[in-house]
């Protein structure tokens, strides 16, 4: 990839890092509304980062004429599509807060391993020179969700232990068409799963605190 094409990646990632909530990873005792606000903010930043990464990877590696057919083939690629998690806001509103938190935790934990290999597919890009930054952000969100679960624990069965699964690692062989398609698919799933987690958290926050920002 040409040096000029790396610039948007670097600028986007740098901006998101600057906007990331301070004292990341720390969830001291605080009001429930603050726990939800922090978790939602982290999920929003991660979803935006995933969406921008997917878009830039697509622009750099996937010919425009092939994108539509490839995207259709990716529909059944994400393992998260095989679990009984809500697929949108309306379905999420029919689930309890604890169910949504457990699905959110499952989605986040499924990416903790794969994101540690991101730097291997972006070896010429400063954006993912250290993939542990993305890993740390996922860990921050994981801790935030776990803090909420502790506050709302209701004794219901834990689905995460039954459905827990992870994605394959990203493929570093960027000269292979198969590897490019695999990484493209993984980034698509990363974006979709973080969008789901963000949606679940926002639904919970809105129905508990009836905010004007609930229209999303």
Curated annotation (Swiss-Prot):
PROSITE patterns: SOMATOTROPIN_1 (PS00266), SOMATOTROPIN_2 (PS00338). Its main location: secreted. It comes from the Eukaryota. This is Somatotropin. Residues 1-26 form the signal peptide. GO terms for biological process: animal organ development; bone maturation; cell surface receptor signaling pathway via JAK-STAT; cell surface receptor signaling pathway via STAT; cellular response to alkaline pH; cellular response to insulin stimulus; cellular response to thyroid hormone stimulus; cytokine-mediated signaling pathway. GO terms for cellular component: extracellular region; extracellular space; growth hormone receptor complex; nucleus; plasma membrane; secretory granule; trans-Golgi network. Plays an important role in growth control. Its major role in stimulating body growth is to stimulate the liver and other tissues to secrete IGF1. It stimulates both the differentiation and proliferation of myoblasts. It also stimulates amino acid uptake and protein synthesis in muscle and other tissues. The modification Phosphoserine is found at residue 131. GO terms for molecular function: cytokine activity; growth factor activity; growth hormone activity; growth hormone receptor binding; hormone activity; metal ion binding; prolactin receptor binding. Disulfide bonds join 78-189, 206-214. Pfam families: Hormone_1. Keywords: Disulfide bond, Hormone, Metal-binding, Phosphoprotein, Secreted, Signal, Zinc. Zn(2+) binds at residues 45, 198. InterPro entries: 4_helix_cytokine-like_core, Somatotropin, Somatotropin/Prolactin, Somatotropin_CS. It is found in: Secreted. The keyword Protein biosynthesis does not apply. The keyword Acyltransferase does not apply. Belongs to the somatotropin/prolactin family. Gene3D superfamilies: 1.20.1250.10.
